[in-house]
Structure formats: structure tokens, C-alpha cells
Amino acid sequence: MSGHSKWATTKHKKAIIDGRRAKSFAKLIKNIEVAARMGGPDLAGNPGLELAVTKAKKTSVPNDNIDRAIKRGAGLTGEVVDYTEIMYEARGPQGSALLIECLTDNKNRAASEVRLAISRNGGTIADPGSVSYLFARKGVVVLPKNGLSEDDILMAVLEAGAEEVKDSGENWEIHSEPSDLQAIRDALKEAGIDYETDEAEFVPSMQVDLDVDGAKKFMKLVDALEDLDDVQNVYSNADLSEEVQAALDSE
């Protein structure tokens, strides 16, 4: 799930790693195909493709797979790549809100599978606009702290368009407008600071704390959604207190 690192830490113990990795590869490949279709196969002239390829390489997607995806998306193999982006809105346990971002070649299948996963796992599908207003599209760069202070990060990226630096446990998160992501990446490289991920994400304006029971139900719902091939990202305003996280980690 895109968003808070506490979820990633907790879910890591419960995930079947190889299966998740394979699904992650497939979703990264789909992003490359779409970017190549929209802007062509040249990384230098297609920032969206360059970003998709960089992300895939950071996740160890083999170069051969990346090259084939670029050619397929750009129409150089004769195959037709035609995906549609769809966003679904949902309510989860204890007032939590979710945005489910899909990339699909079959809208009816995606709608049916997403609705079924939500209804079977304690959520409810929401009307368009009733959840999305709780989120804003932001560029998010995540980097390990590695002894760096908030001021160290701000000095490196403030002039590149960074809006804020947030403490996210073991990591720092830099938030910006999505259009400033490239400038922030360049500023970090110039400062010699390594980062882990850089994404355009939907960031909640406020977060909702879940108790242990709510967190378990929420993770079950998100797992079911992320298992769907058409689902690219799940964004939420759900959060965990340190006490709830400790209780989950102890199980």
C-alpha cells in the first residue's frame, strides 16, 4: 500500500514475499508500457518513462523485462497495449477512507473485482468525490534517515520545490508538487543523499487512527485489493499509534 511506512513494516511479516514480488513486477511493467505508449520509447525525451524505469530498476525488475515492456508499449512489437486508468473510492473500518487506483484493459472486470473485494472484506464502495476530497496529489520522496536531520534534508531540497519534510519513523518523507519531483531528485543527488522511492501519490489531509481490531480488518481489506492484478495503488488516511503497531507486531 502506498503511504505510511508503519503499514509496510507490519504487513511485511504477513505477506507471502515471492507472490508479492511477482505482482509488484507485473504492475511496474504495466506502468512502463503505459508511459512508453503515451510518450514514446526514448527515456531522455519521456520523463514519465524514465521515472517508471527507474522505479522498476530499484525493485530489481530484470533489464530484459524492462526493454520488452518499452518496445511493447511503444508499439515496436506489433502488440496493442491499451490500458485505462480508473479510480475507485471506498470506506474502510472505523471511518478510514481509501482511494483504489486501477490500470486495466477491461473496465468491467476491474469494477467487478474491486467491488467484490471491498464488500467481502468489511468495506463499502463510496460515491465519486465523497472520499477523494480528503486527499491531495503530491510528489513523495522517501529516504532513510541515515543520521540526517530534518534541516539537512530541507537545506538540500527547499529551493527545488519541497513543501515539507515529514518524520516517518525510520525514514524522512519529502512532500512537493508532483511536477517538482525531478528537481528534488536532482537536488538530492547533487547533495549526495540517497533516496528509496519517489512517487506521485494521493496524500491524506488528515489521518484516522485505528485500534488493533480496526487495523486487522483494514489490512485484510488492503491485502484483498492489492492482490487484484488491475489494482496499481491503494491510498488511505488510516494510521497506527505506536501502541497498536506494537500489539500487531507481537502477534
Curated annotation (Swiss-Prot):
InterPro entries: Integrase-like_N, TACO1_YebC-like_2nd/3rd_dom, TACO1_YebC_N, Transcrip_reg_TACO1-like, Transcrip_reg_TACO1-like_dom3, YebC-like
GO molecular function: DNA binding
Keyword line: Cytoplasm, DNA-binding, Transcription, Transcription regulation
PANTHER family: TRANSCRIPTIONAL REGULATORY PROTEIN YEBC-RELATED, TRANSLATIONAL ACTIVATOR OF CYTOCHROME C OXIDASE 1
GO cellular component entries: cytosol
Highest taxon of the lineage: Bacteria
Identification of the protein by name: Probable transcriptional regulatory protein AAur_2300
NCBIfam families on file: PRK00110.1, PRK12378.1, YebC/PmpR family DNA-binding transcriptional regulator
GO biological process entries: regulation of DNA-templated transcription
Pfam families for the chain: TACO1_YebC_N, Transcrip_reg
Location of the protein in the cell: Cytoplasm
Family membership: Belongs to the TACO1 family.
